[in-house]
């Protein structure tokens, strides 16, 4: 039934398999035991934060150096930034003797040591970061440098548009179980910007950092927070000849009706200039920021509409008085309108400037 000599060959194969697998099983048991009882090799996600020195919190000094800032979107209230992020802190576990080591500075990979978990609060999605350098001094001071790019969300205030100034914020926090463990500080020597940093249509005034004294709760954990502020002001000169002056010229043309005696001509003039103003306003509206509050430009546009409304009433009253055989009274109202409209318009603009700019 079976080939001759089959049973002895099967027995020999089983014996050979036992001789092969028994040593391998023993090695596996030893390796599992070493992994179970040996201390872990700490990496960035495994090393616990260094303990406070002399019952003081661990201070992480931060700095952001702007390389470029671009694509400021008024409607989305976002901007893009390309910059360096520098961190420094002391970890005594990394201290070494430069004489014995033969080096004055040691370099590490990000996975080899503990690194504070710095997060950008108002960044859309996650920042794109490339670690440039991680170096450690003999006393354990760690210098961390990365280059990053991000799209940042920052609320804008358009109340004074187009004469507005804005503060663009970049918020940093550090994750910590207890605020006594890790706090953020500003390294002023590492805060700055390139001289050629610019934003189209804006003047960059300053770039500073502010430490927020009050921590806030996030996911039942307290955070330490920094606020990097980029102060900018809008280049408003182009808005004057392109938006403001055309609206004023159209309005002033309608006032020539106060020097005409023809009712039909006056009505045609006022209504046609009103239509021109509406058409121009629709064209300008596409470039104006959409806000739930009144802006300075919006207030001027609304005020101009009011003057058109009053001008139509004046022309109608003037014609009514003439029909009712009161030409003298109609003429006096017309003469008064020639002075009253410009004066009231000037006073209204002064009031608006005071309300929006606090002069």
UniProtKB/Swiss-Prot annotation:
Residues 259-261, 324-326 are cytoplasmic. Homopentamer. The lineage of its organism: Bacteria, Bacillati, Cyanobacteriota, Cyanophyceae, Gloeobacterales. This is Proton-gated ion channel. GO terms for cellular component: plasma membrane. It comes from Gloeobacter violaceus (strain ATCC 29082 / PCC 7421). Belongs to the ligand-gated ion channel (TC 1.A.9) family. GO terms for molecular function: extracellular ligand-gated monoatomic ion channel activity; identical protein binding; potassium channel activity; sodium channel activity; transmembrane signaling receptor activity. Cationic channel with similar permeabilities for Na(+) and K(+), that is activated by an increase of the proton concentration on the extracellular side. Displays no permeability for chloride ions. Shows slow kinetics of activation, no desensitization and a single channel conductance of 8 pS. Might contribute to adaptation to external pH change.
């Amino acid at each position: 039934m079976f080939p001759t000599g089959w049973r002895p060959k099967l027995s020999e194969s089983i014996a050979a398999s036992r001789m092969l697998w028994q040593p391998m099983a023993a090695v596996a048991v030893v390796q599992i035991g070493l992994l179970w009882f040996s201390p872990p090799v700490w990496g960035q996600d495994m090393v616990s934060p260094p303990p406070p020195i002399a019952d003081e919190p661990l201070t992480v000094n931060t700095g952001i150096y702007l390389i470029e800032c671009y694509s400021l979107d008024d409607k989305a209230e976002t901007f893009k930034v390309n910059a360096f992020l520098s961190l420094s802190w002391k970890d005594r576990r990394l201290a070494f003797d430069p004489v014995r080591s033969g080096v004055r500075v040691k370099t590490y990979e990000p996975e080899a040591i503990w690194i504070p978990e710095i997060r950008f609060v108002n960044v859309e999605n996650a920042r794109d970061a490339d670690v440039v350098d991680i170096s450690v001094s003999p006393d354990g001071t760690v210098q961390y440098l990365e280059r990053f790019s991000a799209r940042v969300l920052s609320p804008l205030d358009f109340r004074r548009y187009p004469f507005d100034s804005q503060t663009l914020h970049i918020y940093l926090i550090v994750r910590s179980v207890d605020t006594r463990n890790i706090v953020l500080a500003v390294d002023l020597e590492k805060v700055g910007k390139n001289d050629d940093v610019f934003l189209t249509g804006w003047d960059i005034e300053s770039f500073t950092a502010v430490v927020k004294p009050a921590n806030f709760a996030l996911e039942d954990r307290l955070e330490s927070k920094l606020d990097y502020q980029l102060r900018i002001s809008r280049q408003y000169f182009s808005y004057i000849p392109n938006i403001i002056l055309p609206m004023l010229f159209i309005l002033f043309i309608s006032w020539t009706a106060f020097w005409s005696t023809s009712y039909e001509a006056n009505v045609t003039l006022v209504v046609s200039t009103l239509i021109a103003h509406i058409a121009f306003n629709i064209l300008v509206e596409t470039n104006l920021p959409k806000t739930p509050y009144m802006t300075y430009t919006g207030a001027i546009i609304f005020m101009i509409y009011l003057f058109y409304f009053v001008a139509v009433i004046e022309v109608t009253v003037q014609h009514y008085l003439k029909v009712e055989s009161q030409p003298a009274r109609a003429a006096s109202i017309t003469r008064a309108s020639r002075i009253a409209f410009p004066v009231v318009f000037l006073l209204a603009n002064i009031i608006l400037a005071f309300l929006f700019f606090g002069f």
